[in-house]
Amino acid sequence: MEVLKNIRIYPLSNFITSTKNYINLPNELRNLISEEQESKLGFLHIIESDFKPSVALQKLVNCTTGDEKILIIDIVSIWSQQKQRQHGAIYMNSLSCINITGLIVFLELLYDSPMDALRRCQVDNFNFQLRGIVIDNLSFLNFESDKNYDVINLSKFEKLFKILRKLREFLGCWIITKSFPTDFYNGIENTLVDKWSIKRKSGVTLYPTKLPDSYMKGMDLIIYREVVDGRPQYRRIAALEE
């Protein structure tokens, strides 16, 4: 028993690293970065005003081959309700993930015990590689109300990105997240305004969405989808350094 008291338990991730997967951009997005940049693309954030996933986002998800899977954390309850689900996709559609704390708890479980986390997604066959994780939509997350509101939620986003980075290192999966553009928050009855009061010291918004700049700066590429004359157009907000 004395021997057991001195035994230390270490996470498996301390000893195992996975081969990294990279995001394959669909044709309509490939003109935004060079081939060399695309070959290093692990973190992508998409800003678009549609509730439903755009065609480009669906193409990004529908890129699995063989024994690969993509985990879709369906905060908006859109993906899992589609009549034709994405091939090779696993869906996490739980009330526990509609607040940022619950989302972080689930992702930490995915890091510490992937099989236990995936069982919550009704997965019973684990003979596959997790190619990527999609989180749609960060703008719908509920946040804690407190006198230190801004500090709390900013720190939660920093924690969110930290666990996403750890998952990429451990599982090799790429990360795609989505949010609404800034002007969308002033939409119907201003329903999304109050909870998005994270202040910036400079008073200047660096990105056309109301996520913390510290989170956005962690992305390899940020794409902004606009509709001009009835047609979708994509432009790059940030990309990998040359």
Swiss-Prot record:
Keywords carried by this UniProt record: DNA damage, DNA repair, Nucleus
A single BP term in Gene Ontology: error-free postreplication DNA repair
GO CC terms: cytoplasm; cytosol; nucleus; Shu complex; site of double-strand break
Subcellular location: Nucleus
UniProt-listed InterPro entries: P-loop_NTPase, Psy3
One Pfam entry name: PSY3
Domain of life of the organism encoding this protein: Eukaryota
Subunit organization: Component of the SHU complex composed of at least CSM2, PSY3, SHU1 and SHU2.
Miscellaneous comment as given in the Swiss-Prot or TrEMBL entry: Present with 876 molecules/cell in log phase SD medium.
Function: Required for resistance to the DNA-damaging agents methyl methanesulfonate (MMS), cisplatin and oxaliplatin, but not to mitomycin C. Plays a role in protection against mutation accumulation. May be a component of the recombination-repair pathway.
Protein name (Swiss-Prot/TrEMBL): Platinum sensitivity protein 3
